[in-house]
Regions:
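Conserved SF1/SF2 helicase motif Ia
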Residues: 164-169, 174-215, 299-303
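Pre-Walker A (Motif I) flank of P-loop NTPase domains
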Residues: 157-163, 188-190, 238-240, 303-306
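Conserved helix/coil segment N-terminal to the catalytic DExD/H
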Residues: 180, 222-265, 273-279
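N-terminal accessory nucleic-acid engagement/regulatory domains that precede
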Residues: 1-121
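Conserved interdomain linker/interface between the two RecA-like ATPase lobes of SF2 helicase motors
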Residues: 319, 333-359
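Conserved pre-motif I regulatory segment
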Residues: 116-164
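Post-DEXD/H (motif II) to motif III coupling segment of the RecA-like Helicase ATP-binding lobe
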Residues: 259-260, 264-265, 272-338
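Conserved nucleic-acid-binding Ia/Ib motif block in the N-terminal RecA-like helicase ATPase lobe
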Residues: 191, 197-244, 336
């Protein structure tokens, strides 16, 4: 208790007044606020929040609604936003008692406003963050179409999508960038489902080469010590991106660590594996929707968790299967971003031969 009192008194006076005013009349905080002789204000709370958190939250967020409906959750959300370490995560007991905290943080820091305030114009702008995280000035285009940028921006806006980009066409960056942005803005975790363990390792290593270390993979190739360390990094909030295989979603350990984190998106790589019409059909892919359903129910999510599906090529029937699956299981509508299947750096032709000698 003495530590809590000391921590309270170390806060700037304006924030003590703000927090006390939000918590005034809440039975669970009455004793503490009385003990520290808290000061209150009755008007101007939204204006005080905007002043104290300028540059940290969207200036057009509906603060009146949050103050009226979720004063306790808003207080915890603002306290978490105050932390300088983006890897700090909300304690489990807070999420248990105030599950709205994750929703509030998303509303304040990861929901773009139509007016494009200073915060959204920089912190939620994909081109600005492309330079920040990867050092690139521009996104890749496909026959003059900025599909990569559009898909990344759609993800930042919270949309679910299906992107059909050619192999080597930059699909990884398209989901890695929004994931890193969400990790820094809302302490969120993006789960990437991939069927190939070697591909997971390659992507983690490539990001590490760029100085991006808040990425973890958990798969069957890891020795027990490395696996334990990877799990601990996810639990401690050190990961913004987690690569796993679809089979791992059935693991109780994986379920436990994901329940303790704020999941902001599921990314499904090689999404053609959903379709029985595809040559690489994986039955475990069909469990992804059920897992997301279960997670949303247990966490009492106020908004659906969006998904991003990626594949290099897909027939129309496969595309329809993917879209139908997420509509039926999660009631999600996938926005389609598709490039042509042709590769300008590859050419092939068919030459008819009559016999082995001609070959």
């Amino acid at each position: 208790l003495l530590d809590e009192i000391a921590c309270w008194r170390s806060l700037p006076k304006e924030k003590r007044i703000l927090f006390a005013s939000l918590l005034k009349g809440k039975k669970e905080f009455e004793g503490f606020l009385s003990m520290v002789s808290a000061e209150y204000i009755h008007k101007g709370i939204p204006e005080l929040i905007k002043e104290l958190y300028a540059g940290k939250i969207c200036q057009h967020a509906d603060l009146d609604m949050l103050i009226n409906q979720y004063p306790c959750g808003l207080t915890y959300a603002l306290a978490l936003i105050d932390t300088t370490d983006y890897r700090s995560i909300t304690p489990g007991w807070v999420l248990y008692n105030y599950p709205e905290v994750e929703f509030i943080i998303k509303l304040l820091r990861h929901t773009t406003c139509k007016e494009s305030c200073d915060y959204c114009h920089t912190q939620l702008d994909v081109l600005h963050n492309l330079k920040t995280f990867f050092g690139y000035e521009h996104f890749r285009t496909y026959e003059g179409e900025p599909l990569q940028e559009r898909a990344a921006q759609a993800a930042v806006k919270g949309k679910s999508l299906l992107a059909i980009f050619p192999t080597g066409g930059g699909k990884s960056l398209t989901f890695q960038l929004p994931a890193l942005m969400a990790g820094h803005s809302v302490h969120g975790l993006t789960v990437v489902i991939s069927p190939l363990q070697s591909l997971m390792k390659d992507q983690v290593d490539n990001l590490a080469d760029k100085g991006i270390t808040d990425v973890v993979t958990i798969n069957g190739m890891l020795d027990p010590i490395t696996r334990s360390l990877s799990i601990q990094r996810v639990q401690d909030g050190e990961a913004s991106l987690l690569y796993i295989s679809p089979e791992m979603l059935r693991s109780k350990t994986i379920e436990k660590i994901l329940m303790a984190r704020h999941l902001v998106r599921f990314v499904i790589d090689e999404a053609h594996c959903f379709s029985s019409w595809g040559q690489d059909f994986r039955v475990d892919y069909l469990y992804i929707g059920k897992f997301i359903q279960k997670y949303q129910q247990k966490k009492k999510c106020k908004t659906p968790i969006p998904v991003s599906c990626f594949t290099a090529t897909a027939k129309q029937k496969v595309i329809q299967d993917i879209c139908d699956y997420f509509k039926q299981t999660l009631n999600l509508n996938l926005e389609l971003f598709a490039s042509t299947a042709s590769r300008t750096n590859l050419h092939y032709s068919v030459i008819h031969v009559e016999n082995d000698n001609d070959k």
